[in-house]
UniProtKB/Swiss-Prot annotation:
The gene is NXF2. The NTF2 domain heterodimerizes with NXT1 and NXT2. The formation of NXF1/NXT1 heterodimers is required for NXF2-mediated nuclear mRNA export. The leucine-rich repeats and the NTF2-domain are essential for the export of mRNA from the nucleus. This is Nuclear RNA export factor 2. InterPro entries: Leu-rich_rpt (IPR001611), LRR_dom_sf (IPR032675), NTF2-like_dom_sf (IPR032710), NTF2_dom (IPR002075), Nuclear_transport_factor_2_euk (IPR018222), Nucleotide-bd_a/b_plait_sf (IPR012677), NXF_fam (IPR030217), RBD_domain_sf (IPR035979). LRR repeats lie at residues 271-296, 297-320, 321-348, 349-376. It comes from Homo sapiens.
Length: 626
C-alpha cells in the first residue's frame, strides 16, 4: 500500500470527479489502476484546449501537464504522513469518472501553494457539481455563495456533459466550498453535492492575453463600436486586418479570448445594447455566459452564421433580457419540425423576445408584479387591493390580446414549464342538432362523459409547449372583453386563483360569427422574471344563451371589468359617445382616451389634438367611412 501511495501522491493532487448516474463504493483491488489510469482524459479538451473543438485524442504534451505536477509534488513530501496507513477507497462507474479519497483524514493543506510551474501558482482548485447542468448559473453561484463562509471568485464556469465546473484560487475558499457540499437543496428538494480538487491553473489564466495584445484588441473593438446605437460589431473578428497585422489570433471559442473580449466590454462599453457575434464559428457559449454580468443591458444579440448545434446552448445566456435575436445559419435551426416549434424553443430561453431572425413575433404575456405588494388571503369575491385588480386585469388584457391575434405562440411566457391544461364541453355526440362545439369535442376532458382512463390522461395537457400547441389548434376567436367578469376566489403569498367568465365568437370556418360562452379557471404563481405564471388552466366552453348572444359585442370596451368593479356609469357612456362623435375615433379608443385623462373631457380633447397632430394615433383607431 505504501508503494502505491508513493506512486500516486496524496488526495490533494488527484483529480476527483463524480459519477453522473449510479455509482458504488468498493475497496481498491490489487493491481488496480493508478492515478494516470483514473485521470479523465476528456478534460484535456477544457484544461488545455480552451473550448476548441475536442480532438479525437488528447495530444501527448497536453496530457502530460498534470502528470508532471503530480511527480513534482512527490519531491516536496519527505514526512511519512499517517495517512499512508489509512484505508483507501475508490468510487468508480461505467462512465469512467472516478474519485479516490482517504477515509477519516483531511488532506494536508500547508504546502498547497508552494510549487509553481511556468510562472503560475499551483494554488488552484477545480470545483465540480454533479448534475449541475440542471441549474441556472446565476442561481447556482448565488446559492453556493450564500452558504459559503468565505467569499470566492469563480473562474471559467462551464458545463462538461451534465456537470457544472469552475475554478477558484484560494485554499481557504476551497476548504469552505467543500463544507457547502450537501447543504444546498434544489427545487426538487434534492441535496447538491460539491467536489473540490487540486488543479492546474485554468486555460484562460495560463493563456491570458498579454498587455499589448489586450490594448490592440481594445483599439479594434473601439473602431467597431457605434456610439449612437450603442452597438458593437464583432462579426468575423478573427480575420480583422488590424489584429492579423499584429499576428494576434482572437478565436472566440477559446475561453481566454472570450474572457478578454467581455472584460473590455465591461470596462469600455457598460451601456452596450446590441452585440453582433456573427460568423465567428462559435459552437458553444460557455465563455459568453459571463455576459449576463459584464453587459446585462444587451437587448439585441446576433449569433447568426455560427456552428451552434443545439438550442440548449442558449440557456447559458438566458439571463439576458433579449428583445431581438439572430440565429439563422446555425445547424440548430434545422433541428425543428416547423417554425412554430423553433419559436417555442427559443422563447423558452428568452420570454420577452420580440424579433427572431428579423421576423416580428407576437408580443409575449409578461406582467410585472410589484414585489413590495404581498397578496393577502381573501375569501370573498374580488375584494383585493387595487394593485391586485390591476395585475389580474392587465394580465388578462394581454393574454386575450395574443389569444385572439391568430398566433398563440406568444402565450408561452404566460405558463409554467410543467403547467397543466384541460378543456371540457357539455356536448353529447349523439345529439343530432348542429353545434359550434363540434370542433372542441375531440379535446374535451369532461369527466362526466369520459370513461376511458387512457384518454383521461392523454387529454390532460402537460408542459407549456403542449398547452400552447393545443390552444393553437383551437378555432380562431375574438373575445368580447366588455362581457368578461373576473372572480378572485383564493389568494396566498405564493398562489393566486381566479375565474374568468365571458363570451367570444369564432372568426373563421363554417361557424364564423357563432357566439360561445366560456368559464376559465387559472391558478397562478409569481414567475421567475417577476411575472404572473400560470400553473393550472381549465377551460369550459358552452353554447351561449340567447340573451348572451344578443348582448355580445354590442358595446365595444377596451378594458376588462371585475365582478366588484362596476361598468361605466350613464354619464361616462354619454361622454364616450360624444367624444367618439367629435373625434371620429371608435368607441373603445374614445373610452381609453377619456380613462387615460381621468374622465376630464377637456383634457382628453387636448391630448387627442396633440397626438393627432404628431401622427401618433394609428389609423385603426378611427371609424371607417363607407
Amino acid at each position: 500500500m505504501c508503494s502505491t501511495l508513493k506512486k500516486c501522491g496524496t488526495y490533494r493532487t488527484e483529480v476527483a470527479e463524480c459519477h453522473d448516474h449510479g455509482s458504488t463504493f468498493q475497496g481498491r483491488k490489487k493491481g488496480g489502476s493508478s492515478f494516470r489510469d483514473n485521470f479523465d482524459k476528456r478534460s484535456c479538451h477544457y484544461e488545455h484546449g480552451g473550448y476548441e473543438r475536442p480532438p479525437s485524442h488528447c495530444q501527448e504534451n497536453d496530457g502530460s501537464v498534470e502528470m508532471r505536477d503530480v511527480h513534482k509534488d512527490q519531491q516536496l513530501r519527505h514526512t511519512p504522513y499517517s495517512i499512508r496507513c489509512e484505508r483507501r477507497m475508490k468510487w468508480h462507474s461505467e462512465d469512467e469518472i472516478r474519485i479516490t479519497t482517504w477515509r477519516n483524514r483531511k488532506p494536508p493543506e500547508r504546502k498547497m501553494s508552494q510549487n509553481t510551474q511556468d510562472g503560475y501558482t499551483r494554488n488552484w482548485f477545480k470545483v465540480t457539481i454533479p448534475y449541475g447542468i440542471k441549474y441556472d448559473k446565476a442561481w447556482l453561484m448565488n446559492s453556493i455563495q450564500s452558504h459559503c463562509s468565505d467569499r470566492f471568485t469563480p473562474v471559467d464556469f462551464h458545463y462538461v456533459r451534465n456537470r457544472a465546473c469552475f475554478f477558484v484560487q484560494d485554499a481557504s475558499a476551497a476548504s469552505a466550498l467543500k463544507d457547502v457540499s450537501y447543504k444546498i437543496y434544489d427545487d426538487e428538494n434534492q441535496k447538491i453535492c460539491i467536489f473540490v480538487n487540486h488543479s492546474t491553473a485554468p486555460y484562460s489564466v495560463k493563456n491570458k492575453l498579454k498587455p499589448g495584445q489586450m490594448e490592440m484588441l481594445k483599439l479594434t473593438m473601439n473602431k467597431r463600436y457605434n456610439v449612437s446605437q450603442q452597438a458593437l460589431d464583432l462579426q468575423n473578428l478573427r480575420f480583422d486586418p488590424d489584429l492579423m497585422g499584429r499576428d494576434i489570433d482572437i478565436i472566440l471559442n477559446r475561453r481566454n479570448c472570450m474572457a478578454a473580449t467581455l472584460k473590455i466590454i465591461e470596462r469600455n462599453f457598460p451601456e452596450l445594447l446590441s452585440l453582433n457575434l456573427c460568423n465567428n464559428k462559435l459552437y458553444q457559449l460557455d465563455g459568453l455566459s459571463d455576459i449576463t454580468e459584464k453587459a446585462p443591458k444587451v437587448k439585441t444579440l446576433n449569433l447568426s452564421k455560427n456552428k451552434l448545434e443545439s438550442a440548449w446552448e442558449l440557456g447559458k445566456v438566458k439571463g439576458l433580457k433579449l428583445e431581438e435575436l439572430w440565429l439563422e445559419g446555425n445547424p440548430l435551426c434545422s433541428t425543428f419540425s416547423d417554425q412554430s416549434a423553433y419559436v417555442s424553443a427559443i422563447r423558452d430561453c428568452f420570454p420577452k423576445l420580440l424579433r427572431l431572425d428579423g421576423r416580428e413575433l407576437s408580443a409575449p404575456v409578461i406582467v410585472d408584479i410589484d414585489s413590495s405588494e404581498t397578496m393577502k388571503p381573501c375569501k370573498e369575491n374580488f375584494t383585493g387591493s387595487e394593485t391586485l385588480k390591476h395585475l389580474v386585469l392587465q394580465f388578462l388584457q394581454q393574454y386575450y390580446s395574443i389569444y385572439d391575434s391568430g398566433d398563440r405562440q406568444g402565450l408561452l411566457g404566460a405558463y409554467h414549464d410543467e403547467a397543466c391544461f384541460s378543456l371540457a364541453i357539455p356536448f353529447d355526440p349523439k345529439d343530432s342538432a348542429p353545434s359550434s362545439l363540434c370542433k372542441y369535442f375531440e379535446d374535451s376532458r369532461n369527466m362526466k362523459t369520459l370513461k376511458d382512463p387512457y384518454l383521461k390522461g392523454e387529454l390532460l395537457r402537460r408542459t407549456k409547449r403542449d398547452i400552447v400547441d393545443s390552444l393553437s389548434a383551437l378555432p380562431k376567436t375574438q373575445h368580447d372583453l366588455s362581457s368578461i367578469l373576473v372572480d378572485v376566489w383564493c389568494q396566498t403569498e405564493r398562489m393566486l386563483c381566479f375565474s374568468v367568465n365571458g363570451v367570444f365568437k369564432e372568426v373563421e370556418g363554417q361557424s364564423q360569427g357563432s357566439v360561445l360562452a366560456f368559464t376559465r379557471t387559472f391558478i397562478a404563481t409569481p414567475g421567475s422574471s417577476s411575472s404572473l405564471c400560470i400553473v393550472n388552466d381549465e377551460l369550459f366552453v358552452r353554447d351561449a344563451s340567447p340573451q348572451e348572444t344578443q348582448s355580445a359585442f354590442s358595446i365595444p370596451v377596451s378594458t376588462l371589468s371585475s365582478s366588484s368593479e362596476p361598468s361605466l356609469s350613464q354619464e361616462q357612456q354619454e361622454m364616450v359617445q360624444a367624444f367618439s362623435a367629435q373625434s371620429g375615433m371608435k368607441l373603445e379608443w374614445s373610452q381609453k382616451c377619456l380613462q387615460d385623462n381621468e374622465w376630464n373631457y377637456t383634457r382628453a380633447g387636448q391630448a387627442f389634438t396633440m397626438l393627432q397632430t404628431e401622427g401618433k394615433i394609428p389609423a385603426e383607431a378611427f371609424k371607417q367611412i363607407s
